[in-house]
Amino acid sequence: MIIWIASYPKSGNTWIRSLLSSYLFSESGKFSFELLKNIERFSIKIDKANIKVKSNYQTEISKNWIPSQIKINRDKKIRFFKTHNAMCAINGNKFTDKQNTLATIYIIRDPRNLVTSLAHHYQLNINDAFNFLTNKRKIIFPINSNYKNKKELKP
């Protein structure tokens, strides 16, 4: 079964994964970046066999959310996964369900700190970061996309 570590980007997901991985996967309790591999991003585990090679569309990927989780859960082991996905459905495809989820750790960060973190991470000014976060038509980190140009983040 899956335990989700869910958050909006720049909210402390990696920090929580660092604490959990040090506690759960280290004999000494000491942190190393190698330990973070024990709590992967869910998007890495999505079964992409049925997705067109050049597809960047969340709709196509969302069709594989539940089937991928069913496949992951076949051995009945408890696994942690990082996600920035919302508990949503895209074209009727739910992100997860009770049959595949054991628990969720939901991380919430003060939005004022989130704005400054996003601005610093993407080298934006505070106003551009705020406008990006409050734009209802924007998403962060679409699957299969890498932001190499901060202009892509501009509102």
What does each model-identified segment do?
Residues M1-P155:
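PAPS-dependent sulfotransferase catalytic domain
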